[in-house]
């Protein structure tokens, strides 16, 4: 089943200070020959694309001023290796609109990048994808004398070849064609339209899959086609060539949408490079075995058969290593980069006397020019003298005869001046290489390419520590900072593009943390942290990361409700379109235009009585409130930990009941919600078994153990993500670059329920039937993205408005909000920006496909945010509103642009993108504040008295039997011996507390040493109270409370009303347990078995306040 996940990447503190440096090797160097502009771009394995202004293009010597100046733009575009990059060269494009590029990546995405004319800000959007790593992208040329027909057009417009455009496809509509190839064995042909939206259309898919599951595409090159024969009786009826992993060269025609020629086994191994030369008359290809071939692309027809002959091989050479990159446009002047780090200049115009000259040798240049930097890069290697030089990933020649190239072993950009053979290096940064999530599920230990170990906090998104190498290896640091706090997994962490990423899936709300673990965080919403209360860690993280986004949506929701309320009652009789007041642009009539969400700036609201038949169409629900909406609204009525502080009283320690009944709030007989719930119970299996009905206990009642509950938890119904349609037909339009399909259908007046339909719902029979149809409708189309949730909310508001009585209308109260912020959830201050990603994980796919990504700045804290849950504790809907003072400009404060990130998007634009692309389950967790929590896994354990011999190491069935069949007296023989762990984990008691206990026990205190309190001198516990079941998150001190309460007689400490955590010890396998340790931690650290945990109890001796008082008085 397909799954949508949300991930966020932690931005390194030096991100903004190293705009001109990659942190992983550079994969592509592109010099776009744009008149009047001097800059080049680099893309890297760190997923970023850097625009370097003319710092490297000037022939003037570098000065200190030019060296210090940071004149580059770093664009974090991808979440995996950026593998290739092209410039979009459109005819008659507006220079003031800036420049456009397209990049492809190992994250399966094709991204359009727009840079403004001043080269100061940038923007991006996903316009396409593949099902595996994308390795290459090339623009498509065309023949000037032939029409180039697009599939979506009835007739292709005449295209005129323009030498300035270098033959790139343009037509009257100024479209741009390009192809992409990848490891999914597919080549996709795309058309990018002109205009501000720049929509990408998938025109055709070439399938190169072979019978032996091979055919991955590694390299491509465009060809200027020649479909008719010239005077030499030659032609080129193809417009690009691809090289695959089998060594085949495949020539395709985008005009005719077919494979024209295939040269099988053109190389023995996979092809690394294909490049057309000399105006597409020659082709050079290289393979991983070091073979270099040159082909003549002027094909001839066979005189006898008339078939098109294959391109002729006119030269072949062998090099001692694989050629990874080729730079040049003519055979007489080429530059090669090989897998050993050498750069060669080649002249292959004379095939009998080919010349290949090595102009760069890594040993010589590294020793002479950058010896210190190289040693620093390899500081973590075992032998600093052993230097490994990787291959050359890419080469680019600038107009000033400077050759740029990159190694696969570092992130440096190397510059070789061909005029004076001067070599220099622009040093790159350092990237993370591995990570380990600690058991507290909040801290992560990482290692970077510099050999440094660091500790990160994934809740506050900050770098906590950078450790010196003297503190040990990576594993040593992990062991040192692994605490005894062991929590269940709520996320997974990984290192991608040199950054630390945290992936959240729909089960992230299953982990809770005690308030004592949050004391070091800065809470910004005035929530008082209770150290003994449990908080949902996943909810804390998402509410802290998206705090400002939530406030933005709350404000938009309030403006929408004001607009709805501003309608007059008489307008209900007519079909009405309500503008929410956010629209700043006129709506387009293009049917394929990207749809906005229901709360988006250009959204509209339609309400009215249009369905006179009283029977709504099958595509629309027949109930005034959707089933999902009713369920979600009722959930906060359940008792849970998020509604109240978790009660640690003994009343929650009780036996497991034999049966449980569904829990529902009592409704009046005339309540619509009551009848709806009755209909759900009778028609929906989900309502009777999943939402409010706890799981039935298993086993026989006499053997049922006691249950120690930490809270009143109810199972939570999780809305599983539906499979998304794999929309890969021809002419697929990527109007919305972040979606797989159109997620929202147009809301027409015919789809809305009428008043007559609502009146019929007053009968329980029709309500029951309509509930069934509603559930069936939901099964047909389950929500996937946040606009689906916003549509449900808007429909609910319309129903509230339509059902509002005249009396309520006169009270001037807004409809009740459906966006509920987490009022009891602490909001943590996030210290840095994050890279937010939305992935689609298809069943059977090799990885996740990126649907959306954006840089999210940390939330600003203002008065509204600091008030936190106060707004939700008393919603503003109960206040009267002035309809004449509806302020539609409340969102202006979100127009702030974070210049340090380099993006041209302000916060409002970022939030609108999030609104379009966040998964439904994630948005529901943000805005619905569901009060039910996941039922904690329960563990079985036994409590038995501690024995000074053997401990619980030999505890098992025999010890259990001995304990159960023990004599009525539990008085010990008075053994005064104690093991070395007696004092471990005991808490110190202040003198004032000791004096308090002294006053309590000054009467009836034992006077002789024979009656001194011993570790085993404790009352017995009845057999019925020995076997227990408790949630894994229960603390040891609460188990102590239960143990003391189940003693058959009271101890002196109990008579003194001392807390059991002060005088009672619990042990597991001889280890004294800390009071704050959870039962999960005990099982993981000490018990290390799947069987019932055996805990032993005894009295503390040395640190007991009561013992101190007794001994002190005896000495007087």
Swiss-Prot record:
Alphabetic keyword roster: Cytoplasm, Phosphoprotein, Repeat, WD repeat
Compositionally biased intervals (Polar residues): 747-776
Positions of post-translational Phosphoserine modification: 668
Disulfide-linked positions: none
Signal sequence interval, chain numbering: none
Coiled-coil region list: none
Keyword Zinc on entry: no
Role, per record: Ubiquitin-binding protein involved in the resistance to phenanthroline, sanguinarine, nordihydroguaiaretic acid (NDGA), isopropyl (N-3-chloro-phenyl)-carbamate (IPCPC) and guanosine 5'-O-(2-thiodiphosphate).
Name listed for the protein in its UniProt record: DUB-associated factor 1
Organism: Saccharomyces cerevisiae (strain ATCC 204508 / S288c) (Baker's yeast)
Lineage, highest ranks first: Eukaryota, Fungi, Dikarya, Ascomycota, Saccharomycotina
């Amino acid at each position: 089943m397909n799954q949508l996940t949300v991930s966020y990447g932690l931005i390194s503190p030096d991100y903004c200070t190293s705009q001109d440096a990659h942190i992983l090797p550079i994969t592509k160097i592109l010099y776009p020959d744009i008149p009047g502009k001097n800059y080049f771009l680099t893309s890297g394995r760190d997923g970023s694309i850097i625009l370097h202004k003319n710092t490297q293009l000037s022939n003037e010597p570098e000065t200190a001023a030019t060296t210090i100046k940071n004149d580059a733009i770093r664009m974090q575009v991808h979440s995996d290796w950026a593998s290739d990059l092209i410039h979009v060269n459109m005819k008659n494009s507006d220079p003031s609109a800036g420049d456009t590029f397209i990049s492809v990546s190992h994250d399966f995405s094709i991204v359009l990048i727009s840079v403004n004319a001043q080269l100061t800000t940038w923007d991006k959007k996903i316009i396409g994808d593949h099902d595996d790593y994308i390795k290459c992208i090339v623009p498509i040329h065309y023949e000037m004398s032939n029409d180039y027909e697009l599939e979506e057009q009835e007739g292709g417009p005449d295209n005129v070849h323009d030498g300035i455009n270098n033959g790139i496809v343009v037509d009257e509509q100024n479209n741009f064609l390009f192809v992409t190839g990848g490891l999914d064995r597919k080549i996709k042909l795309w058309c990018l339209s002109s205009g501000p939206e720049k929509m990408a259309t998938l025109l055709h898919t070439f399938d190169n899959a072979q019978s032996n599951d091979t055919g991955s595409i590694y390299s491509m090159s465009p060809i200027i086609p020649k479909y008719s024969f010239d005077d030499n009786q030659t032609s080129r009826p193809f417009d690009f060539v691809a090289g695959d992993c089998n060594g085949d060269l495949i020539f395709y025609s985008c005009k005719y949408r077919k494979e024209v020629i295939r040269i099988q086994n053109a190389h023995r191994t996979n092809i690394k490079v294909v490049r057309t030369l000399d105006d597409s008359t020659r082709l050079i290809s290289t393979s991983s075995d070091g073979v270099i071939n040159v082909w003549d692309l002027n094909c001839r027809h066979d005189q006898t058969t008339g078939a098109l002959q294959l391109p002729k091989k006119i030269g072949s050479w062998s090099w001692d290593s694989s050629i990874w990159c080729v730079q040049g446009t003519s055979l007489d002047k080429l530059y090669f980069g090989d897998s050993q780090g050498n750069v060669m200049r080649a002249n292959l115009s004379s095939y009998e006397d080919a010349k290949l000259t090595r102009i760069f040798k890594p040993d010589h240049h590294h020793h002479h020019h950058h010896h210190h930097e190289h040693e620093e890069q390899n500081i973590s290697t075992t032998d600093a003298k052993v230097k490994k030089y990787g291959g050359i990933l890419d080469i680019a020649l600038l107009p000033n005869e400077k050759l740029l190239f990159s190694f696969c072993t570092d992130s440096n950009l190397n510059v070789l001046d061909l005029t004076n053979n001067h070599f220099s290096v622009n040093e790159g940064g350092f990237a993370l290489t591995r990570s380990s999530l600690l058991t507290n599920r909040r801290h992560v230990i990482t290692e970077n390419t510099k050999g440094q170990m660091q500790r990160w906090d994934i809740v506050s998104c900050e770098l906590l520590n950078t450790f010196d190498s003297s503190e040990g290896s990576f594993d040593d640091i992990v062991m040192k900072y692994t605490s005894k706090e062991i929590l269940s997994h709520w996320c997974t962490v990984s290192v991608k593009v040199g950054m630390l990423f945290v992936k959240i899936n729909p089960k992230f709300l299953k982990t809770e943390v005690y308030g004592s673990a949050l004391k070091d965080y800065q809470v910004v919403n005035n929530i008082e942290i209770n150290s003994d209360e449990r908080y949902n860690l996943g909810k804390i993280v998402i509410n802290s990361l998206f705090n400002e986004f939530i406030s933005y949506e709350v404000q938009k929701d309030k403006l929408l409700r004001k607009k709805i309320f501003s309608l007059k009652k008489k307008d209900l009789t007519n079909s009405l379109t309500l503008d929410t007041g956010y629209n700043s642009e006129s709506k387009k009539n293009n049917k394929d235009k990207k749809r906005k969400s229901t709360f988006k700036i250009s959204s509209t609201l339609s309400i009215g009585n249009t369905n006179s038949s009283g029977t709504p169409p099958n595509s629309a629900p027949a109930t005034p409130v959707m089933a999902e909406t009713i369920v979600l609204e009722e959930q906060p009525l359940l008792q849970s930990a998020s509604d109240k502080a978790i009660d640690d009283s003994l009343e929650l320690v009780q036996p497991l009941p034999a049966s449980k009944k569904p829990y529902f709030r009592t409704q009046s007989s005339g309540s619509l919600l009551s009848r709806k719930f009755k209909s759900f119970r009778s028609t929906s299996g989900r309502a009777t078994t999943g939402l409010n009905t706890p799981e039935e206990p298993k086993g026989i009642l006499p053997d049922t153990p006691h249950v120690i509950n930490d809270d009143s938890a109810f199972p939570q119904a999780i809305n599983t993500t539906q499979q998304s349609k794999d929309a890969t037909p021809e002419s697929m339009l990527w109007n919305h670059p972040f979606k797989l399909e159109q997620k929202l259908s147009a809301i027409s007046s015919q789809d809305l329920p009428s008043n007559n339909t609502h009146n019929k719902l007053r009968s329980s029979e029709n309500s029951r039937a309509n509930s069934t149809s509603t559930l069936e409708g939901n099964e047909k189309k389950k929500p996937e993205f946040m606009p689906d949730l916003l549509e449900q909310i808007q429909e609910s508001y319309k129903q509230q408005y339509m059902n509002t009585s005249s009396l309520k209308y006169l009270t001037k109260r807004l409809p009740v909000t459906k966006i509920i912020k987490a009022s009891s959830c602490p909001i943590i201050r996030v210290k840095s920006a994050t890279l937010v990603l939305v992935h689609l994980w298809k069943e059977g796919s090799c990885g996740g496909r990126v649907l959306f990504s954006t840089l999210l700045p940390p939330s600003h804290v203002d008065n509204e945010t600091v008030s936190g849950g106060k707004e939700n504790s008393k919603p503003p809907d109960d206040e009267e509103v002035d309809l004449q003072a509806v302020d539609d400009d409340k969102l202006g404060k979100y127009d702030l642009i974070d210049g340090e990130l380099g993006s041209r998007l302000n916060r409002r634009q970022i939030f609108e993108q999030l609104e379009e692309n966040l998964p439904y389950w994630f948005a529901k967790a943000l805005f619905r504040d569901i009060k039910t929590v996941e039922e904690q896994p329960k563990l079985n354990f036994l409590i038995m008295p501690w024995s000074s011999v053997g401990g619980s190491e030999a505890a098992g069935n025999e010890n259990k039997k001995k304990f159960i069949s023990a004599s009525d007296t539990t008085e010990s023989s008075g053994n005064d011996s104690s093991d070395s762990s007696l004092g471990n984990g005991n808490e110190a008691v202040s003198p004032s507390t000791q004096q308090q206990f002294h006053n309590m026990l000054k009467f009836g205190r034992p006077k002789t040493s024979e009656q001194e309190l011993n570790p085993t001198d404790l009352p017995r516990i009845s057999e019925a109270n020995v076997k227990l079941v408790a949630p894994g998150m229960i603390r040891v001190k609460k188990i102590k409370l239960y143990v003391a309460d189940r003693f058959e007689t009271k101890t002196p400490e109990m008579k003194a009303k001392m807390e059991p955590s002060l005088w009672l010890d619990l042990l597991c396998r001889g280890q004294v347990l800390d009071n704050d340790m959870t039962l999960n931690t005990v099982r993981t650290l000490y018990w290390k078995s799947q069987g019932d945990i055996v805990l032993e109890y005894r009295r503390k001796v040395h640190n007991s306040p009561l013992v101190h008082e007794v001994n002190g008085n005896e000495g007087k």
